[in-house]
């Protein structure tokens, strides 16, 4: 399996080992566009892997802070209570760059930037950039993708 993320179309495509499309999902990448620098709040390009899978068995809407469940489940009332929170929900696929000097090591390290593919709240619009660097998905879609891919799956982000 391989994950391809096309930034211009805001689509994530899961591809099998024979190159056939298994499934496509609408996503939301960074509102600042693409870029690899730490602190840019951009989505990094290039070849990555899924370094860690976080959230197995958690309920849909589980809120994560620093990759740990908070015990909260997202709803609109919680959203109103914490309007500026960066909502990381349901499941996390933590990415690691595979290209030293481009998206790995130093000031361009995807993993040290905490770039994930993760679930988003119901108010987040898919198909348009809106994150602060991560790839957001609908909660039902991240559960589906999470269950289909193992750690070390290749992720290609095209921008």
Language model segments and positions:
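A structural motif detector for short, solvent-exposed N-terminal "entry" segments of globular domains
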Residues: 1-33
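Soluble periplasmic/extracytoplasmic beta-strand elements of cell-envelope proteins
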Residues: 4, 13, 49, 92-94, ...
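Extracytoplasmic
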Residues: 7-9, 22, 45, 88-90, ...
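Short, surface-exposed secondary-structure junctions/capping segments
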Residues: 35-53
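Exported/periplasmic cell-wall-interacting domains
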Residues: 60-159
